[in-house]
């Protein structure tokens, strides 16, 4: 039997390079090897967008379109909407009964986002309990493997702790999922922070060449390099991070030329802009084709709802029996 692999996306806007190289690439590469679950986390989106939820549905459909255009194949992957599986909410409730507040309050991702998103009121139960809902997302299908970026590891550890505590209290049932780190676990945004829609620093997959070029030109490269022929320090350069993704085979030569002052930051930015744009040519073509038949996406989500719904119903029946409220 194939192991289950699961990942989710917040439908709060268009997909960007951080998504693609964070975990989508892993899902595409491993589609035939695992039983795949790929879902859109519209409840999670409400944790930060509860004051302005009107765009979530539109963004969700755009997100599914992007995923299919990138190569996520419904024949190998269950594509579904979080809110279409009500059993996730019920499982979250059960987990919340025994999850200590200290587990949530110590989560570094929680503290980081509260500090970074100061314009939003995140002093809510929904935002604090984000990792509990995430645990329910994962454990409702008893997933074995979770593709994640480094910043999501603390959340996954909370999922393991919740599974552990449930198994201890009510008997062995849940699998403790393990992470699959992507090769580019942290893609830098235009300001040097992790690429994120929330930080307004993302290069989107649907961006045109001029937009990509403009965003790449905004990036900080080497603050110690004053003149183009000065020796460079690629280890601190955000543009060099993209070379690691897109030109893995020639990375040593690029690093050498940079350190010797034989290639300037402007040259690198120009090359990376073109590489990024050209790498998305097939995606743009497929996305345009899918957009001509929107029912195609609705049908995919409906099928995913049916398939995952059956799994979720069984999990909840088993959990109720374990707890003793069946």
Name each model-derived stretch.
Residues 1-2, 310:
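N-terminal amphipathic alpha-helix/helix-capping segment at the start of soluble metabolic enzymes
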Residues 2-136, 284, 288:
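N-terminal Rossmann-like or analogous alpha/beta NTP/dinucleotide-binding catalytic cores
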Residues 11, 146-147, 201:
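A generic structural motif
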Residues 19, 154, 160-326:
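Conserved nucleotide- and phosphate/pyrophosphate-binding catalytic cores
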Residues 51, 147-150, 230, 260:
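Conserved aromatic-histidine-acidic binding/catalytic patches
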Residues 90-93, 102, 106-169, 173-191, ...:
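Classical nucleotidyltransferase
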């Amino acid at each position: 039997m194939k192991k289950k692999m699961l990942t989710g996306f917040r439908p709060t806007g268009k997909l960007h390079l951080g998504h693609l190289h964070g975990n989508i690439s892993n899902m595409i590469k491993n589609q035939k090897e695992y039983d795949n679950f790929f879902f859109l986390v519209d409840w999670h989106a409400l944790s930060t967008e509860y004051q302005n939820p009107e765009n979530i549905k539109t963004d969700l459909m755009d997100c599914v379109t992007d995923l299919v255009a990138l190569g996520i194949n419904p024949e190998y992957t269950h594509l579904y909407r979080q809110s279409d599986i009500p059993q996730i909410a019920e499982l979250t409730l059960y987990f919340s009964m025994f999850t200590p507040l200290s587990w949530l309050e110590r989560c570094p991702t929680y503290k980081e986002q509260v500090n970074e998103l100061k314009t939003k009121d995140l002093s809510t139960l929904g935002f604090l309990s984000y990792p509990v809902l995430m645990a329910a997302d994962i454990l409702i299908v008893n997933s074995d493997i979770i593709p994640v970026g480094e910043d999501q590891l603390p959340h996954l550890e909370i999922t393991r702790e919740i599974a552990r505590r449930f198994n201890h209290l009510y008997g062995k049932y849940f699998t403790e999922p393990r992470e699959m780190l992507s090769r580019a676990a942290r893609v830098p945004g235009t300001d040097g922070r992790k690429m994120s829609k929330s930080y307004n620093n993302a290069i989107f997959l649907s961006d045109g060449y001029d937009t990509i070029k403009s965003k790449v030109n905004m990036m900080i490269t080497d603050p110690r390099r004053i003149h183009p022929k000065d020796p460079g320090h690629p280890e601190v350069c955000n543009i060099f991070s993209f070379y690691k993704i897109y030109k893995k085979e020639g990375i040593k030569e690029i690093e050498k030329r940079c350190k010797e002052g034989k290639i300037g930051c402007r040259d690198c930015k120009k090359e990376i802009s073109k590489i990024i744009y050209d790498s998305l040519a097939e995606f743009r073509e497929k996305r345009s084709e899918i957009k001509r038949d929107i029912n195609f996406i609705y049908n995919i989500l409906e099928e995913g709802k049916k398939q995952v719904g059956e799994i979720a119903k069984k999990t909840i029946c088993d959990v109720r029996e374990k707890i003793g409220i069946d």
